[in-house]
Swiss-Prot record:
Family membership noted in the UniProt record: Belongs to the ubiquitin-like protein UBact family.
NCBIfam families: ubiq_like_UBact
Region (Disordered): 1-56
Domain of life of the organism encoding this protein: Bacteria
Residues found modified as Deamidated glutamine: Q56
Claim: Translocase is one of the keywords in the record: no
Listed GO MF terms: protein tag activity
Post-translational modification: May be modified by deamidation of its C-terminal glutamine to glutamate by the adjacently encoded deamidase. This could be a prerequisite to the subsequent conjugation, as shown in the other prokaryotic ubiquitin-like protein Pup.
Role noted for this protein: May function as a protein modifier covalently attached to lysine residues of substrate proteins. This may serve to target the modified proteins for degradation by proteasomes.
Lineage: Bacteria, Pseudomonadati, Verrucomicrobiota, Verrucomicrobiia, Limisphaerales
A Pfam family per the record: UBact
Listed name of the protein: Prokaryotic ubiquitin-like protein UBact
Keyword 4Fe-4S: no
Positions with biased composition (Basic and acidic residues): 26-48
Length: 56
C-alpha cells in the first residue's frame, strides 16, 4: 500500500497581507447597570437570573 502524502496548510495569513476579509465591527458594550435597572422594572426575578448567568 502506498503511503498517503499529507498536505501542509499555511498557518497564518498569506504573503498578501491577509487584510482582505471583513473585520469585526467596533461596537461598544451595553451599560449593564442600566440594563439591569430596566429589567428589574419588568421582572425582578429575571434580573436576578441574568446577574447569575453573567457573573455580576
Amino acid at each position: 500500500m502506498p503511503d498517503q502524502a499529507q498536505k501542509t496548510r499555511p498557518v497564518g495569513p498569506g504573503p498578501s497581507g491577509g487584510g482582505e476579509g471583513p473585520g469585526s465591527p467596533k461596537v461598544e458594550k451595553p451599560n449593564t447597570e442600566e440594563l439591569l435597572k430596566r429589567m428589574r422594572k419588568v421582572d425582578p426575578d429575571q434580573a436576578k437570573r441574568y446577574r447569575q448567568r453573567t457573573g455580576q
